[in-house]
Amino acid sequence: MAAYKLVLIRHGESTWNLENRFSCWYDADLSPAGHEEAKRGGQALRDAGYEFDICLTSVQKRVIRTLWTVLDAIDQMWLPVVRTWRLNERHYGGLTALNKAETAAKHGEAQVKIWRRSYDVPPPPMEPDHPFYSNISKDRRYADLTEDQLPSYESPKDTIARALPFWNEEIVPQIKEGKRVLIAAHGNSLQGIAKHVEGLSEEAIMELNLPTGIPIVYELDKNLKPIKPMQFLGDEETVCKAMEAVAAQGKAKK
C-alpha cells in the first residue's frame, strides 16, 4: 500500500511550443491550446477526487498559469504555492528562440538530438549579443541569483543538479509530513524528479517524453520509492499522442 502520493503536471503548450521554438528561460505564455490542456488536466484531477495541501512551481508564467488553471478546475485556488527558479525549464543557451525544425534542417537532426537529448552535453552558451540575453539575464525575478547560479546554458544534468536541492530540502519534508503535494513544472525539471524518484539511468531519462497538461501520479512507499510506474490521468490514446508530439519537436520538416 502506498504511503504517499505525488502528482506532477507539465505546463500546457506555450506560444513558443506552438511555434516549435526553444523556450528556455524566455517567459512564453500558454497558447490557447495549452490553456485547454491545463483545463483538461485539472478536470481529470477533479474527476478523480484529488485534493492537495501545497503546490510547488517555477517562476515562469506558462507553468504558473497552468497551475492556476488546474487549481481553478479543482476549486482549490486558495492553496499555498511555492515558486522557485530551481524548477525552471532547462536553459537552452544560444538555441533560445530558434525554431527546432529549422535548427535541425541547418545543423542536422543528429546534432539537435545531441543538444536536446544528451544527458551531459550542453548547447552553445547564450552570449551577450543574443537578442534575448538582457530579457532573461537582467530579469528582476533572478536578481538574487549569484553569477554561478544564473546560467548561460544548461545540459539536462545541470538542470537536474539545480532542481534536486529544492526536492531534497523543500519537497521531501512536505511529503514526509503527510502533505498532498502537486508540482507544476517543465519537461526537463520534471525529468529530473522522475530520474531521482525512479532511479532511472541517464539514457532512460533522456528518452522519457513527458506529455503536456496531463497529470502524472506517483504512489510512493515510506522511503519515497515508487511502488508502481508513473501513471497518467488520461486515456491511453491522448497520452501517446502527446508524448509523440514532444518527441517530434527536434525533427526537420519533410
Swiss-Prot record:
The keyword Ribosomal protein does not apply. The active site is at H11, E89. The modification Phosphotyrosine is found at Y26. It is an enzyme of class 5 (isomerase). Gene3D superfamilies: Phosphoglycerate mutase-like. CDD domains: HP_PGM_like (cd07067). Pfam families: His_Phos_1. It catalyses: (2R)-2-phosphoglycerate = (2R)-3-phosphoglycerate; (2R)-3-phospho-glyceroyl phosphate = (2R)-2,3-bisphosphoglycerate + H(+). The modification N6-acetyllysine is found at K106, K251, K253, K254. Keywords: Acetylation, Glycolysis, Hydrolase, Isomerase, Phosphoprotein. GO terms for molecular function: bisphosphoglycerate mutase activity; hydrolase activity; phosphoglycerate mutase activity. The modification N6-succinyllysine is found at K251. This is the product of a processed gene created by retroposition from mRNA of an expressed gene. This gene seems to be expressed. HAMAP family: PGAM_GpmA (MF_01039). This is Probable phosphoglycerate mutase 4. It comes from Pan troglodytes (Chimpanzee).
